[in-house]
Amino acid sequence: MADKIKVMIVDDSALVRQVVAQALASDPGIEVTDVASDPIFALQKMKVRWPDVLVIDIEMPRMDGITFLKKIMAEHPTPTVICSSLAEKGAQATFEALAAGAVSIITKPKIGLKSFLEDASNDIVQAVRSAARANLRALSASANPAINRPKLSADAMLSTGSHRALERTTDQLVAIGTSTGGTQALEAVLTRLPATAPGIVIVQHMPEKFTAMFAERLDGLCQIEVREARNGDRVLPGLALIAPGGRHMMLKRNGAQYVVDVADGPLINRHKPSVDVLFRSVAKFAGANALGIIMTGMGDDGARGMKEMHDAGAKTIAQDESSCVVFGMPKEAIKLGGVDQTMPLQQIPGAIVGYGKSC
């Protein structure tokens, strides 16, 4: 029998510690071995027993979560999940934590905390399982969860009417899908693109209200414009549109232009936004005029959509295992036969630029 994933929860709220521990206890493959009310107590306990995964808050007494995380990553790199407030200050600190090496985010509201965390128990379990599989070396350069949601396909969001994909034209676009480790991977890719890069549509699995700040942060770092997508936005050269957290994003055709349709809907592959929803819509409306890229992430969201893009004539790329934080989504896309080429993260910007020049 495989060893259990040993978890330490560090949060100054006794309620958060209790509810997160209860959620994790529902998975027989996870064991909460320690809890601590602040990083100082946590460091003392970690001298005796080091966890496989940390779940930590950002704002804590005596030492904040960012300082704690940086100390841990310098001394003994450990997969870490951030449990942060949805408040703007908390969200900004969360991106700093992701940059410092945290693997993923669990959001918590200021009001209705207990009921929210109970409802999000599956997300908590998934985040810890994903973190336990993380390749932390990729950040710096498979059991099923006990609680299952119905796993819907992208058919639930996409119309079933016939539509002939366009023959290859000069209107090219790039579609990117990613999850765990994706915030760092997207930054590494987008910051290396020139302002003349093809139009880009992106799904990054991320909680609601975080995507706008994430896009704003990237926009300040990139030559291209980066922003959270709005319904009806045109896909234009030099612009990257990121699907809003909690909403699906689909490509549509409006006359001679590509536009995005941002809409609510069910969880697809247990995600909203879903990479499959985006990729399958790109296959349907762009066909051979698209480049699809699937990057680091746990699970199989995007694998079917990439296969449909490939079959529609699009060029497809998967990030390779060595540079992925979690080699899940790319692996599943490769298994389905939907990937033309695999490459390390550092080569993806060049592939996008080369694709744009070939158009």
From Swiss-Prot:
Q: Which residues form the active site?
A: 179, 205, 301
This protein's GO CC annotations: cytoplasm
Q: Which UniProt keywords apply?
A: Chemotaxis, Cytoplasm, Hydrolase, Phosphoprotein
Which InterPro entries did the record assign? Answer: CheB-like (IPR008248), CheB_C (IPR035909), CheY-like_superfamily (IPR011006), Sig_transdc_resp-reg_Me-estase (IPR000673), Sig_transdc_resp-reg_receiver (IPR001789)
Name the reaction it catalyses: [protein]-L-glutamate 5-O-methyl ester + H2O = L-glutamyl-[protein] + methanol + H(+); L-glutaminyl-[protein] + H2O = L-glutamyl-[protein] + NH4(+)
Positions carrying 4-aspartylphosphate: 57
GO MF, one example: protein-glutamine glutaminase activity
- SUPFAM superfamilies associated with the record: CheY-like, Methylesterase CheB, C-terminal domain
Q: Which residues form a coiled coil?
A: none
Please list every transmembrane segment annotated in the UniProt record, as residue ranges. none
Protein biosynthesis: is it a keyword of this entry? Answer: no
After translation, the protein is modified as follows:
Phosphorylated by CheA. Phosphorylation of the N-terminal regulatory domain activates the methylesterase activity.
What Enzyme Commission number(s) does the record list for this chain?
3.1.1.61, 3.5.1.44
User: Subcellular localization, per the record?
Assistant: Cytoplasm
Boundaries of every Response regulatory domain copy? 6-123
Q: Which residues form the CheB-type methylesterase domain?
A: 167-359
GO biological process per UniProt = chemotaxis
Q: Which Pfam families match?
A: CheB_methylest (PF01339), Response_reg (PF00072)
The similarity comment for this entry is: Belongs to the CheB family.
What the protein does comes down to: Involved in chemotaxis. Part of a chemotaxis signal transduction system that modulates chemotaxis in response to various stimuli. Catalyzes the demethylation of specific methylglutamate residues introduced into the chemoreceptors (methyl-accepting chemotaxis proteins or MCP) by CheR. Also mediates the irreversible deamidation of specific glutamine residues to glutamic acid.
User: Entry's PANTHER family?
Assistant: PROTEIN-GLUTAMATE METHYLESTERASE/PROTEIN-GLUTAMINE GLUTAMINASE (PTHR42872), PROTEIN-GLUTAMATE METHYLESTERASE_PROTEIN-GLUTAMINE GLUTAMINASE (PTHR42872:SF6)
Query: What is recorded about the protein's domains?
Result: Contains a C-terminal catalytic domain, and an N-terminal region which modulates catalytic activity.
Which protein are we looking at? Protein-glutamate methylesterase/protein-glutamine glutaminase 2
Q: Give the originating organism.
A: Dechloromonas aromatica (strain RCB)
